[in-house]
């Protein structure tokens, strides 16, 4: 029987393999023992720590944990709050309809009637002078002389001038000194109110302090625009007109006639006949009323009045009785007639007059004027009906003058 020697063990491959496996299993066993032992030690340590740490300390730890969690959540809450605040700040009632896709800084809501040169580098446009006002007149070439006198009075002051050419003649005005600086708009046989509705939008004339919307048949020898406006501002008039010289003018309503005492009057007195007016009267035409041949509006009053002008009612009859609603306050105080600056209303029959180029006879001209007058009365009735209907249907509107 052979003895078992160490040499033979080292040289036998099978024994070498057995030795390697034994070493591997031994190492694995030791690792398992170490892991399990460590777990028991850690568990035992936690148990001991739990026994040694007071309950209130545990609660504090939990509280700190909750506080830390709330801190982690705060940025998200603040983010929501910021988004909500930003959303509210972006809700602006002043955004112009149609401009929503544009950044606010590029939107120009208003404009003006000032002309800009065609040449030279573009410059930042200066705003219209805060003292500037607007004179707008419907004109025909036959009244060129009287219109020239009116505009000359205004052009020497801080006014922009706009002419509405209802006869289509524009070139024959070019010889007048002020013509090149005026705005000329031409549309055949259209009225002052037709032009005003379409070319004097409140956002276009907003830069101007006052809007003078005058007829062409006015004489202005005793009228000075600058003095007139100083009186209007001092008296707080939002809607006004210069008084008419009773000796030379066509007077349709007594309230427009000039009084020799004082600078302004706001009511008339009539004690006989129909339509009596006293100091207790609060409705037009006794008070709060001007005639439509030479009204003057503040920009705020015009913004209101423009909306009342009807697109299809080109003579605006009936509008005068309701202008007090646009007076920005008590119409018995905010509407008035300026006596110290007065004019003459000649009453020329311009609309529907004869057209020499067409060879119209005087009879035809008279017929045209009669047709104009008839349509004016029809428009008056239509406007009254619309006003009554609008008052009845608008449940959100409050009538400032229920006696009206």
Where are these regions (language model features)?
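C-terminal catalytic/acceptor-binding lobe
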Residues: 2-118, 311-404
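Conserved catalytic core of nucleotide-sugar-dependent glycosyltransferases
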Residues: 14-20, 219-336, 349-376, 380, ...
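Short, acidic, metal-binding catalytic loop of nucleotide-sugar glycosyltransferases
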Residues: 113-130, 142-161, 168-178
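Short beta-strand/turn micro-motifs composed of small residues
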Residues: 137-139, 163-167, 339
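Structural alpha-beta junctions
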Residues: 153-163, 168-170, 178-184, 234-240, ...
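Active-site-proximal specificity loops/subdomain of glycosyltransferases
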Residues: 164-210, 221-223, 271-272
